[in-house]
From Swiss-Prot:
Annotated binding of FAD, by residue: G14, G15, G16, H17, A18, G19
Compartments, as annotated in UniProt: Cytoplasm
Required co-factors: FAD
UniProt family annotation: Belongs to the MnmG family.
Keyword terms: Cytoplasm, FAD, Flavoprotein, NAD, tRNA processing
Gene: mnmG
NCBIfam families the UniProt entry points to: mnmG_gidA
Molecular function via GO: flavin adenine dinucleotide binding
Functional description taken from the UniProt entry: NAD-binding protein involved in the addition of a carboxymethylaminomethyl (cmnm) group at the wobble position (U34) of certain tRNAs, forming tRNA-cmnm(5)s(2)U34.
Assembly information from the UniProt record: Homodimer. Heterotetramer of two MnmE and two MnmG subunits.
InterPro entries: FAD/NAD-bd_sf, MnmG, MnmG-rel, MnmG-rel_CS, MnmG_C, MnmG_C_subdom, MnmG_C_subdom_sf, MnmG_N
Transmembrane portions of the chain: none
Any one cellular-component term (Gene Ontology): cytosol
Name of the protein in question: tRNA uridine 5-carboxymethylaminomethyl modification enzyme MnmG
Length: 576
């Protein structure tokens, strides 16, 4: 462990998808960065499904890559099955998705971090936070009693905050199988007066590839020419594999229904809300009782790995029940479970405690990213981690923090939704959440965000050169010349949506006027006449940074927004 005299600019707590992006981003910004994690060998672990991207999620990966992040390059290095989802629709909502070899992905992330100058990896548990007399962050205290002094820190604790694993009627503490929970840190956050809640997620059993009757199942092929996520990847080098498709049956549902009382969720042992768009098989059977079957995609977890991920049957039923219902599905009558599925319940911090820079309002110098903010998914976590890491480095250097606005990227949509509306269930990104999705395409992420990254200082020379070449090629195609296939696709999409984009630009300019009206951090909302008690309470709770953010709060009316604008224009009384 680091000595008491050693000082870092930024400490990142947690080595998952948010933590790796935060640590790498802070180090790229020139900050002397430490990544503190329970186990170095688990950095970059894909704890649930072996895939990166999807509808909305793929856009986030492309944006992470445009800002020189890790996820896109690691996904390309590990891709073994690729699909462009939504291809039958317009290019604005195409969703690149890569199934990954878990081992290759983890190795790629660890290699990218090892090659990053200015980044030190430390093993240990963060147990406490030391604050200055003014309430700002001063140091991270480890479970072993070590003190890591820092100017800023990023908490990326995933499902580890007071995490509890549920295997049917059996429970045990942990953030995931094989890793301990972070109980002391959760207690510390409560002690800081932060609003914490409880959420849950789950994962299915893992199956032995050798016990599956593959020939009895229809094949699910990927695309012959997988498209890389990263601008820095020439082509995907890995062999591409096929998946297979099974399905639940009426017999499957009968077994599940007969054992619902033994499920951790339906047995009343879990209080936290689960992800609406990734329900457990118990939820599917109960909520969609009229459906006799549900598809299950059998996804190999690696080229040399005998483990198979059965996508679609996340569960918290006891292991023997899981084995029984799985063996009622086509091709799985002799299936062997390598590990049972389980649910994990964990603490999260109400994201309305944060600014748009992902900084805690109550603790200067402390940032939060990932599932601790109420999101679900690797991609959502990585996007938050990158932004938080950039801002932690800026704070450590005494510079102003930065944000991404809704019309600039899905990262901006994600953060704005979190900090203005909060969450009551794990938040997942979809293209439908972005009102400017025609211009926020996966194909143009580099053109949208790499210039921002260059201004911030988080983009390295290799990406800068690749971006310059892409921008030049796009300009050539727009002028009628010949360019790369990638540049031609970007220009074609722009022309397809040209009329809509022109109209959208005027809407963005109008919204920018509200976003330019700042609300002082200590503004007294009680002086604003005409506000309902509900709206006033929500303003006090969220304390929006601008008039534009206030206008996006749930329940805000045009009349209330006008009253707030009028109050902001009045001169503020001088302090006595």
């Amino acid at each position: 462990m680091t000595s008491l005299r050693e000082m870092f600019d930024v400490v990142v707590i947690g080595g998952g998808h948010a933590g790796t992006e935060a640590a790498a981003a802070a180090a790229r910004m020139g900050a002397r960065t430490a990544l503190l994690t329970h186990r170095r060998d688990r950095i970059g672990e894909m704890s649930c499904n072996p895939a990166i991207g999807g509808i909305g999620k793929g856009h986030l990966v492309r944006e992470i890559d445009a800002l020189d992040g890790v996820m896109g390059r690691a996904a390309d290095a590990a891709c073994i099955h690729f699909k462009m989802l939504n291809r039958s629709k317009g290019p604005a909502v195409w969703g690149p998705r890569a199934q990954a070899d878990r081992g290759l992905y983890r190795a790629a992330v660890q290699a990218l971090l090892a090659a990053q100058d200015g980044l030190t990896i430390l093993e240990g548990e963060a147990a406490d936070l030391e604050l200055t007399a003014d309430g700002a962050l001063a140091a991270v205290i480890t479970g072993a009693g070590g003190r890591i002094a820092c100017r800023a820190a990023v908490l990326t604790t995933g499902t580890f905050l007071r995490g509890v694993l549920h295997f049917g009627e059996r429970t045990e503490e942990g953030g995931r199988v094989g890793d301990a929970a972070s109980n002391a840190l959760s207690a510390r956050l409560r002690g800081l007066g932060l609003a914490l809640g409880r959420l849950k997620t789950g994962t299915p059993a893992r199956l032995d590839r050798r016990s599956i009757d593959w020939e009895a199942l229809p094949e699910d092929r990927g695309e012959a020419e997988p498209a890389p996520f990263s601008l820095l990847t020439g082509r995907i080098a890995n062999p591409q594999i096929s998946c297979r498709i099974s399905e639940t049956t009426p017999e499957t549902h009968a077994i599940i229904n007969a054992n619902l009382h033994r499920s951790a969720v339906y047995g009343g042992r879990i209080d936290g809300a689960g992800p609406r768009y990734c329900p457990s098989i118990e939820d599917k059977v109960v909520r969609f009782a009229e459906r006799p079957r549900h598809q299950v995609f059998l996804e190999p977890e690696g080229l040399e790995d005998e483990t198979v991920y059965p996508n679609g049957i996340s569960t918290s039923l006891p292991e023997e029940v899981q084995e029984a219902f799985i063996r009622t599905m086509p091709g799985l009558s002799r299936a062997v479970l390598l590990r049972p599925g389980y649910a994990v319940e964990y603490d999260y911090v109400d994201p309305r405690e944060l600014t748009h820079a992902l900084a805690l309002k109550k603790v200067p110098g402390l940032f939060l990213a990932g599932q601790i903010n109420g999101t679900t998914g690797y991609e959502e976590a990585g996007a938050q981690g990158l932004l938080a890491g950039v801002n932690a480095a800026l704070v450590a250097a005494g510079r102003s923090m930065v944000t991404v606005r809704r019309h600039e990227g899905y990262i901006g949509v994600l953060v704005d939704d979190l900090v203005t509306r909060g969450v009551s269930e794990p938040y997942r990104m979809f293209t439908s959440r972005a009102e400017h999705r025609l211009s926020l395409r996966a194909d143009n992420a580099d053109l949208r965000l790499t210039p921002r990254g260059l201004d911030w200082g988080c983009v390295g020379p290799a990406r800068q050169a690749a971006f310059a070449a892409l921008a030049a090629a796009v300009a050539t195609v727009r002028d009628g010349g010949a360019g790369s296939e990638q540049a031609a696709a970007i220009v074609a999409a722009d022309r397809l949506y040209e009329g809509y984009l022109t109209r959208q630009e005027s809407e963005i300019r109008a919204r920018a006027k509200d976003d330019a009206v700042l609300i002082p951090p200590d503004f007294d909302f009680s002086v604003v006449g005409g506000l309902s008690a509900e709206i006033r309470a929500r303003l006090e709770r969220v304390r929006p940074e601008t008039l534009g953010v206030a206008g996006r709060l749930e329940g805000m009316t045009p009349a209330a927004l006008g009253a707030l604008f009028a109050a902001l224009r009045r001169p503020r009384p001088l302090a006595a």
